[in-house]
Structure formats: structure tokens, C-alpha cells
């Protein structure tokens, strides 16, 4: 049962909550927040909290800058790494204009609209995200270095794996915050880790991903480390992916359970994701560094699907019951989770609505170049991805024009900065490593 504003006010009063962080994302996925003294929370629920949208990248012009934050009480959680006395609560927010009309830059609202579209088709959507990250040492001033925490590899154990205790702290913390951790392990790269948490309804899954990323960053910092979700922080090592898993439920039945056939709703859904994969890339892989990851160290590059084959962009993992799903392996964690999940879902729903044809599965190892002959590839650069997305009828129908323009304008600035940097590595540290 969803929690109400009164439920949260009662909790605040009974549990010594002193501060409330109202959190949201800009259109590029960067988390922002304002902290309220707990006594201001009733006003926040009743009237919203005004803020200057012109100071948030991609939001508003200065001539009409006021926007209103509306906290979602069902997202309330206490930050477990803060003091037990004078506790700190966090809630995610939706954003409107002062007159109550929807704000086009409210990407959380966009995902809600796509979920509503799925519900109108009789579908419940569950989403699970697998998110990789690196742990780096910091210098004597607390600044991040490019020295990984350890030199362990995939599934290694201590002493090669030095991140085990920190992963345990992350799991315990996110569990307190309402996520359900399932397993964690050392990944392929030195200092690279993965913590997996259980799937959830689409909107909650996007909220959970933001919670996870902020928890990892905070817990790493408390341990004198720096956590990076940058797609390719070490150019000669594995990149950080964000594997997005989706399942569809109709009348209590998981549509991905059993054999996938081209004329099934699950088949049409996969066909829609494949049909729009190139158009989604500017959102799923939104920074120049994203393209150093694609096609290297087990990250996919070609638009294809298969059962279980990890070299494919889309695969159907071996599973049973409610765990049957489709997995999109191309995205990284640099993007806006509400746009990423919303657009992937919208692409799949478009496949169902238009009964798009499902290509034949590709049962080859696409990490061997000769095996990919004849297959369409994802864009090879952010500039190419912007061009594909900007010319897409699908994207034009899904996202407000103002949001598209600001999004692509910002990405074009990133391309220009990267391409003209005297030292691209220094530029990537400032605009990627230190912010993602």
C-alpha cells in the first residue's frame, strides 16, 4: 500500500527526523536536492517548494524560471549513513510549473506517462537494473585518483578483492532504504564491482537506481574512496554497464515465460527495442566516453538479439517464472534513468502496438569482427547518436521538442569540448570521471 503524506509526517515526528532532502534529476540525469528543516514538510506537501529552474541545466530560461517541487511520500527513506540523532530523510520529487501544469523537463513524469500507457494496454512492467562501478583511491587531500582499489578480477576473493566489506556496507544500507539486494561480486576490471538488487515496477526501479548510485558514492566517500560510474574510466579495462532487464505481466502471467515467438507480445516487444535501438543510443549512452565502452571488453555494439548469448545487444537470460525477462546490455549509468527506462519501455510498447517483425536470433560470438558482418551497428560516437536521435520520428513523438532541443544542444557542447580539448584525458576527468 502506498504511503501518504500523513504517514510520512507521523514518521518524522516519531523518529527524530530533523532534515528532509527533496531530490530530483535534471534532464541529463544529474541528481539535485534541497534540504528542508522537518517543520517545513507540511508546507512542502500542501504547496510544493519553489526553486529557480534557470539555474538547473536544461530546465528553464531566466525570464520564466520558477518551478515547483512536489515530494512523493511513497519514496521517503532515511539515509542510514547519517547520524541516528537528528536523522535525515530523502524523498524524490515531481516538478510542475507554478500554475500546476506539467513541466516538460520532469523526466520522472515522462516515465510515469509511459507506465500509464502500458497499463492501458493491460500490462504491468517490472524492471531490474544491473549497475557496475569502479572504486578508486583518493589522495592526501581527498581528491580522486585513477588508482583502482585493487587488482582483482571477475568473482575474485580477498585479498585480491579489496571491495568485499564495502559492498557489504552498500547492501546493508540500500536494504534499509527499501531496495532488496540479491548478490554482489568483484567484476572483471581492477577495482570494479557490481551489486544487484531485485526488480521493481518501472518507476520505483528508476528511483531505486538513483538511490543505489547516491548510496554507493556516499559509502565509498565515508571509506576514503571514490566510486565512479563513468562508462570507461580506465581505457584498457572493462567498462561500466547498466544492463536493463524488463518483464511484462498480463493477468498474472509473465509474457516472457516459455518460448519467445515472433507473433507473441513478448516477441513484438523485443522487436520494438531492436527497431529503435539506434535512436535510443543518445539517451542510453549519453556522453563521449560512452563510445569507448561499446564494442570493447564484452560491451555490445551490434543491433541483434539471442538467447543467453552475452555478446548480443538484447538477450533472453536463462530463467524461470517471474525472473523470465529481456535484457538490454548496451546502456551505461551516465544517463537519466527516467528517460532510459521510459524510452526503452516506449520502444517495446511501440513494437506491440504495431506488431513489428522480430529478426532472426544471431547465435554467434559478435566479439569476433567477422561474426558481425551484415549486422547494423549502434552509433560509433556521440555525434552520430545525436544525429540519429534528432532525425527520429519515434523520439519526436515521445519527448517534448523543448526537452529534445536542450538535451541535444548540451550533448553537442560535450562533443565540441571533447573533440577540441588539448588533452582529451584531462577533459574527460573534469566532465566525466569527477561527475559520473
Which role fits each region the language model picked out?
Residues 1-436:
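Glycine-rich, acidic/polar active-site loops that bind/position phosphate-bearing ligands
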Amino acid at each position: 500500500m502506498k504511503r501518504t503524506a500523513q504517514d510520512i509526517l507521523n514518521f518524522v515526528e516519531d523518529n527524530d527526523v530533523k532534515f528532509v532532502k527533496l531530490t530530483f534529476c535534471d534532464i541529463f540525469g544529474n541528481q539535485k536536492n534541497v534540504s528542508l528543516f522537518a517543520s517545513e514538510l507540511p508546507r512542502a506537501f500542501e504547496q510544493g517548494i519553489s526553486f529557480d529552474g534557470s539555474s538547473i541545466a536544461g530546465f528553464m530560461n531566466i525570464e520564466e524560471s520558477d518551478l515547483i517541487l512536489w515530494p512523493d511520500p511513497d519514496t521517503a527513506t532515511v539515509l542510514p549513513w547519517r547520524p541516528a540523532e537528528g536523522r535525515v530523510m530523502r524523498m524524490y520529487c515531481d516538478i510542475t510549473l507554478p500554475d500546476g501544469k506539467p513541466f516538460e523537463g520532469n523526466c520522472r513524469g515522462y516515465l510515469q506517462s509511459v507506465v500509464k500507457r502500458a497499463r492501458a494496454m493491460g500490462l504491468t512492467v517490472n524492471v531490474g537494473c544491473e549497475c557496475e562501478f569502479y572504486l578508486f583511491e583518493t589522495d592526501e587531500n581527498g581528491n580522486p585518483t585513477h588508482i583502482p582499489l585493487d587488482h582483482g578480477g571477475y568473482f575474485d576473493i580477498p585479498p585480491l578483492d579489496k571491495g568485499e566489506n564495502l559492498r557489504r556496507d552498500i547492501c546493508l544500507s540500500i536494504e534499509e532504504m527499501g531496495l532488496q539486494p540479491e548478490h554482489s561480486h568483484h567484476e572483471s576490471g581492477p577495482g570494479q564491482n557490481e551489486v544487484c538488487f531485485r526488480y521493481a515496477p518501472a518507476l520505483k526501479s528508476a528511483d531505486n537506481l538513483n538511490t543505489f548510485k547516491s548510496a554507493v558514492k556516499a559509502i565509498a566517500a565515508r571509506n576514503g574512496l571514490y566510486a565512479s560510474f563513468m562508462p570507461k574510466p580506465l581505457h584498457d579495462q572493462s567498462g561500466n554497464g547498466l544492463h536493463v532487464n524488463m518483464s511484462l505481466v498480463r493477468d498474472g502471467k509473465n509474457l516472457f515465460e516459455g518460448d519467445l515467438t515472433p507473433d507473441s507480445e513478448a516477441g513484438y516487444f523485443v522487436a520494438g527495442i531492436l527497431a529503435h535501438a539506434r535512436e535510443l543510443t543518445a539517451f542510453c549512452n549519453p556522453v563521449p566516453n560512452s563510445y569507448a565502452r561499446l564494442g570493447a571488453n564484452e560491451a555490445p555494439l551490434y543491433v541483434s538479439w539471442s538467447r543467453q548469448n552475452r555478446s548480443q545487444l538484447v538477450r533472453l537470460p536463462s530463467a524461470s517464472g517471474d525472473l523470465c525477462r529481456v535484457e538490454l546490455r548496451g546502456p551505461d549509468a551516465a544517463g537519466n534513468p527516467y528517460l532510459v527506462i521510459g524510452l526503452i519501455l516506449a520502444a517495446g510498447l511501440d513494437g506491440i502496438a504495431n506488431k513489428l517483425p522480430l529478426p532472426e536470433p544471431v547465435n554467434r560470438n559478435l566479439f569476433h569482427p567477422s561474426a558481425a558482418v551484415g549486422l547494423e551497428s549502434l552509433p560509433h560516437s556521440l555525434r552520430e547518436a545525436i544525429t540519429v536521435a534528432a532525425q527520429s520520428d519515434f523520439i519526436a513523438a515521445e519527448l517534448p521538442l523543448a526537452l529534445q532541443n536542450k538535451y541535444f544542444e548540451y550533448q553537442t557542447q560535450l562533443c565540441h569540448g571533447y573533440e577540441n580539448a588539448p588533452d582529451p584525458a584531462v577533459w574527460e576527468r573534469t566532465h566525466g570521471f569527477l561527475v559520473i
